[in-house]
Amino acid sequence: MSSSQSPAVELAAIREMLRLYCHALTERSVDLQDLKQLIDKNIGWSKNEVATSDGRAIFLPAIVERFDAHSDNFDFLKVMLTQQAGHIEFGSFAFEFDRPAAKFDDLRPKLAEPPDYHDHDHGHEGHHEHANVTELTRFFKLFPNKRLALDIFSIVESGRIEARIMHEYRGIAKTYDAMRRRTVKLRPAMTLLPAREALLESMVRLSLGQKHGVKVPSKHGKIAREIRTMVRLIAEPDATVEDAAEATLRIYARLAKIKNDYLNETEFEELDHRSKRSNRSNKFFGRT
């Protein structure tokens, strides 16, 4: 197949167009760079993500060839860029440890020790390489299992941003949602994962908008429903990055005590998508 017929999309060829698109979304000048720069330096939000940002630049793969059609690969690249622009636009990099959440009662002040970080402390693998890195460093020091806390926070905050994108960026919402549905189909089967990872996977799927077929370990059904309530709170338009932090504290407290053992497929149940968040759950998790 010749290059003219290839379904692959190359970042270099459309970088300037994407930069202008990003500027139109955020009204900010954002540099677009090759993701390989982060991979080579072993930094970024997650080592297996296909795109990331440090709050100033957005890092995208040099070539996208996930799908058979060029248009699908272009849409995928555009959706990745939109999500990272959303992280910049909607405050992922503006986290403040002491700032109150909008949807949750604040647990951070009750758990925090006096900060002992320094300006040279780069916290989590260089994803936030500016002043606010120390704020997240202070937050993640609350957790004995920082890897689990980071996984939870990444899922919750990405879910918040995606919900906000769907609400604010109406022009791309249809394409964005279609790509999310395709992404769900590529996710691992929940029944093949150990218990704790299955619950994390349920969070990913809920944040991607999946309503049917979300399976969770039956013996942890109550925890799964509580997590779903928090995921829904985070998806509300006025939720902030501080809400993502508060949700992380609550979800971590539930998942940390679950043994990450494999279960039989018969030990899973489907979450009832028709369940609504009650006033009681709102009082339990957040503000009335």
Q: Which ranges hold each PLM region?
A:
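Segments forming glycine/polar-rich beta-alpha architectures that bind adenosine-containing cofactors
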Residues: N282-T288
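Acidic, Ser/Thr/Pro-rich beta/coil linker or hinge segments at domain junctions
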Residues: K259-L263
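Basic/hydrophobic alpha-helical interface regions
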Residues: M1-T248, A253, K257
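Extended non-catalytic scaffold regions that mediate assembly and binding
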Residues: F268-S275
